[in-house]
Protein backbone atom coordinates (compact mmCIF):
# COMPACT_ATOMS: atom_id res chain seq x y z
CA UNK A 1 0.00 0.00 0.00
CA UNK A 2 1.44 3.36 -0.97
CA UNK A 3 2.22 6.11 1.51
CA UNK A 4 0.31 9.35 0.99
CA UNK A 5 1.96 12.70 1.69
CA UNK A 6 -0.49 15.61 1.80
CA UNK A 7 0.74 19.19 1.73
CA UNK A 8 -1.75 21.91 2.65
CA UNK A 9 -0.79 25.26 1.16
CA UNK A 10 0.18 26.29 -2.35
CA UNK A 11 2.51 29.13 -1.43
CA UNK A 12 6.27 29.16 -1.83
CA UNK A 13 6.88 26.67 1.00
CA UNK A 14 4.29 24.12 -0.10
CA UNK A 15 5.24 24.37 -3.77
CA UNK A 16 8.97 23.98 -3.18
CA UNK A 17 8.48 21.14 -0.71
CA UNK A 18 6.18 19.20 -3.04
CA UNK A 19 8.68 19.47 -5.91
CA UNK A 20 11.63 18.55 -3.68
CA UNK A 21 9.81 15.51 -2.34
CA UNK A 22 9.20 14.29 -5.89
CA UNK A 23 12.92 14.68 -6.62
CA UNK A 24 13.93 12.81 -3.46
CA UNK A 25 11.27 10.10 -3.68
CA UNK A 26 11.09 9.67 -7.45
CA UNK A 27 11.91 5.91 -7.51
CA UNK A 28 9.26 5.26 -4.84
CA UNK A 29 6.73 7.35 -6.76
CA UNK A 30 7.42 5.39 -9.96
CA UNK A 31 6.87 2.13 -8.04
CA UNK A 32 3.58 3.54 -6.69
CA UNK A 33 4.89 3.36 -3.12
CA UNK A 34 4.40 7.10 -2.50
CA UNK A 35 1.85 9.66 -3.68
CA UNK A 36 2.00 13.38 -3.09
CA UNK A 37 -1.03 15.67 -3.01
CA UNK A 38 -0.94 19.46 -2.72
CA UNK A 39 -4.11 21.25 -1.60
CA UNK A 40 -4.50 24.98 -2.15
CA UNK A 41 -7.16 27.65 -1.81
CA UNK A 42 -6.31 29.09 -5.23
CA UNK A 43 -5.46 27.81 -8.70
CA UNK A 44 -2.92 30.63 -8.93
CA UNK A 45 0.45 31.17 -7.31
CA UNK A 46 1.51 34.74 -6.56
CA UNK A 47 5.13 35.80 -6.19
CA UNK A 48 4.55 37.55 -2.87
CA UNK A 49 8.06 38.95 -2.34
CA UNK A 50 7.33 41.37 -5.21
CA UNK A 51 4.24 42.78 -3.49
CA UNK A 52 6.57 45.32 -1.91
CA UNK A 53 7.20 46.70 -5.41
CA UNK A 54 3.45 46.86 -6.10
CA UNK A 55 3.34 49.56 -3.43
CA UNK A 56 5.64 51.63 -5.67
CA UNK A 57 3.76 50.85 -8.92
CA UNK A 58 6.64 48.76 -10.25
CA UNK A 59 4.63 45.52 -10.63
CA UNK A 60 0.99 44.65 -11.13
CA UNK A 61 -1.01 41.55 -10.29
CA UNK A 62 -0.89 39.77 -13.65
CA UNK A 63 2.91 40.02 -13.75
CA UNK A 64 3.17 38.22 -10.41
CA UNK A 65 0.69 35.42 -11.06
CA UNK A 66 1.26 31.94 -12.50
CA UNK A 67 -1.00 28.90 -12.57
CA UNK A 68 0.07 26.78 -9.59
CA UNK A 69 -0.14 23.62 -11.71
CA UNK A 70 2.56 25.05 -14.03
CA UNK A 71 4.99 25.24 -11.09
CA UNK A 72 4.48 21.66 -9.96
CA UNK A 73 6.02 18.46 -11.22
CA UNK A 74 3.50 16.26 -13.03
CA UNK A 75 3.76 13.53 -10.38
CA UNK A 76 2.03 15.80 -7.85
CA UNK A 77 -1.74 15.64 -7.53
CA UNK A 78 -2.93 19.24 -7.27
CA UNK A 79 -6.37 20.15 -5.96
CA UNK A 80 -7.96 23.53 -5.41
CA UNK A 81 -10.05 22.59 -2.40
CA UNK A 82 -9.41 24.42 0.88
CA UNK A 83 -9.15 22.38 4.06
CA UNK A 84 -11.95 23.04 6.53
CA UNK A 85 -11.03 20.59 9.29
CA UNK A 86 -8.15 18.39 10.39
CA UNK A 87 -8.65 15.05 12.13
CA UNK A 88 -5.15 14.40 13.42
CA UNK A 89 -6.12 11.29 15.38
CA UNK A 90 -7.73 9.78 12.29
CA UNK A 91 -4.96 11.01 9.97
CA UNK A 92 -7.43 12.68 7.66
CA UNK A 93 -8.69 16.10 6.68
CA UNK A 94 -11.93 17.48 5.30
CA UNK A 95 -12.21 19.96 2.43
CA UNK A 96 -14.70 22.62 1.42
CA UNK A 97 -16.07 20.37 -1.33
CA UNK A 98 -17.00 17.80 1.33
CA UNK A 99 -14.22 15.34 0.56
CA UNK A 100 -12.34 13.46 3.26
CA UNK A 101 -8.69 12.82 2.45
CA UNK A 102 -6.52 10.40 4.39
CA UNK A 103 -2.77 10.77 4.74
CA UNK A 104 0.27 9.05 6.17
CA UNK A 105 2.28 12.26 6.40
CA UNK A 106 0.85 15.78 6.64
CA UNK A 107 2.60 19.09 6.04
CA UNK A 108 0.79 22.31 6.89
CA UNK A 109 2.39 25.07 4.82
CA UNK A 110 -0.33 27.70 4.86
CA UNK A 111 1.98 30.64 5.50
CA UNK A 112 0.95 33.66 7.50
CA UNK A 113 -1.60 36.42 7.08
CA UNK A 114 -1.08 39.96 8.36
CA UNK A 115 -3.43 40.96 11.18
CA UNK A 116 -2.89 44.71 11.72
CA UNK A 117 -6.13 44.88 13.71
CA UNK A 118 -4.37 43.03 16.54
CA UNK A 119 -2.28 46.13 17.30
CA UNK A 120 -4.50 48.95 18.48
CA UNK A 121 -4.75 51.72 15.89
CA UNK A 122 -2.45 50.09 13.32
CA UNK A 123 -5.19 49.09 10.88
CA UNK A 124 -6.54 52.64 10.79
CA UNK A 125 -3.19 54.43 10.73
CA UNK A 126 -0.93 52.05 8.85
CA UNK A 127 -0.55 50.13 5.64
CA UNK A 128 1.33 47.01 4.59
CA UNK A 129 2.39 45.34 1.36
CA UNK A 130 2.16 41.68 2.33
CA UNK A 131 -1.01 41.12 0.27
CA UNK A 132 -1.85 42.45 -3.17
CA UNK A 133 -4.85 44.69 -2.36
CA UNK A 134 -3.22 46.38 0.66
CA UNK A 135 -0.10 46.97 -1.48
CA UNK A 136 -2.24 48.67 -4.17
CA UNK A 137 -3.92 50.76 -1.46
CA UNK A 138 -0.51 51.78 -0.16
CA UNK A 139 0.56 52.74 -3.71
CA UNK A 140 -2.47 55.01 -4.00
CA UNK A 141 -1.78 56.62 -0.64
CA UNK A 142 1.90 57.15 -1.45
CA UNK A 143 1.01 58.78 -4.78
CA UNK A 144 -0.95 61.47 -2.92
CA UNK A 145 1.96 62.51 -0.72
CA UNK A 146 3.33 65.86 -1.83
CA UNK A 147 5.57 66.62 1.11
CA UNK A 148 6.45 65.01 4.40
CA UNK A 149 7.92 61.82 5.77
CA UNK A 150 7.04 58.19 5.45
CA UNK A 151 7.57 56.11 8.58
CA UNK A 152 8.29 52.41 8.13
CA UNK A 153 8.23 50.11 11.11
CA UNK A 154 8.08 46.50 12.09
CA UNK A 155 6.58 46.16 15.52
CA UNK A 156 5.52 43.34 17.76
CA UNK A 157 4.89 44.97 21.15
CA UNK A 158 3.69 41.77 22.86
CA UNK A 159 6.11 39.34 21.21
CA UNK A 160 9.16 41.18 19.86
CA UNK A 161 10.89 38.10 18.44
CA UNK A 162 7.98 36.75 16.38
CA UNK A 163 8.92 36.28 12.71
CA UNK A 164 6.79 37.72 9.97
CA UNK A 165 6.37 37.26 6.25
CA UNK A 166 9.44 39.07 5.01
CA UNK A 167 11.90 40.29 7.59
CA UNK A 168 14.09 42.24 5.17
CA UNK A 169 11.26 44.15 3.46
CA UNK A 170 11.30 47.18 5.79
CA UNK A 171 15.04 47.54 5.18
CA UNK A 172 14.63 47.21 1.40
CA UNK A 173 12.03 49.96 1.20
Predicted ranges, named:
Residues 1-3, 76-169:
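FAD-binding core/adjacent interface of flavoenzyme oxidoreductases
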Residues 2-77, 158-173:
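Beta1-alpha1 glycine-rich phosphate/pyrophosphate-binding loop at the start
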Amino acid sequence: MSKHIVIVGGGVGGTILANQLVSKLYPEILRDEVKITLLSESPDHFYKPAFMYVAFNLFFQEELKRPERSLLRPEITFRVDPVTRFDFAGQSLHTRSGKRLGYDFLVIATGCVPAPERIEGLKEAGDHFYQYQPARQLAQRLSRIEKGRVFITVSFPQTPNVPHQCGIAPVET
